[in-house]
Amino acid sequence: MSRIKRFIGSVYSFAADRFYEPIVVNGGFKLFGGNLNDLAIEQGRWAADVAEGGPILDMPVGTAYFTVRLARAHSGLVVGSDIAWGMVARSMEVAEEEAATNLRCVQADAHALPFPDDTFPAVMCTNGLQVIPGLEPTISELARVTKAGGYLFVSVLTLPAPRAVREARRDRLPTIMLSGSDIAAVIERSGLELRTLRSERLATLIEARKPTF
C-alpha cells in the first residue's frame, strides 16, 4: 500500500468516531451537494431492487451512514469495504447497533478489491471517489467485480477545474477537480454502459450497467 493511501486511511480512521458524520455527511455533503444524501439513499434502494436478493458492494463504506440504510432495504448480503480500518470498525459497530445482520465489512484497497470477477449484481460507490487516489484503477476494480448485467451506482462531489485545464491535464488531475462528465467517461472506458447522469449542486450521480455480451 502506498504512503498516500496509508495516510488517507489513517486520517479517515481518526475521523470515524469523532466528526465524520456531523461535519462531512451532515455538513459538507448537504452544503455542497444539496439533496445529495437523500439521492444517495434513493440510489441504494434502486441497487436493492436490481440486485434481487444478490450481494451488494458499497465502497467506501465510511461509517455505514448510507450502507446500513441500504442493508435495511435489501434482503441479501451487503458488503462494505474501506481502506480505513477505523471506518470498518465503526461500520461493524453500526451494523450491530442497528441489527443489520446482513451487513459485513472488510478493510481493502480500492485498487485491489478481494472479490472475484462478476461477484455483485449491484455496486455502490457513495460520495467517496473524490478522495480516492487514482480514478481509473478504482473504476476498473468496481467494474471488474460488478456482475455482467449488473449496475454500478456512483455519487461524487467535485470542484471541476476550468475546461481548458481539464482537457490539457485530465490524466494528472485528482478526481475532485474533474467534472461529472469526465468521471462518466472513465466509467464508459471501463466497459460499462452509462444509463443516467444527473447533477445536484456540486454533486454528480451516475448509474451504469455492465453488458452481458
Regions from the PLM with identified roles:
Residues 1-51, 65-69, 153-177, 201:
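Conserved class I S-adenosyl-L-methionine
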Residues 55-112:
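Class I SAM-dependent methyltransferase SAM/SAH-binding core
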Residues 175-190:
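Short alpha-helix
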Residues 192-213:
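Core SAM-dependent methyltransferase catalytic element
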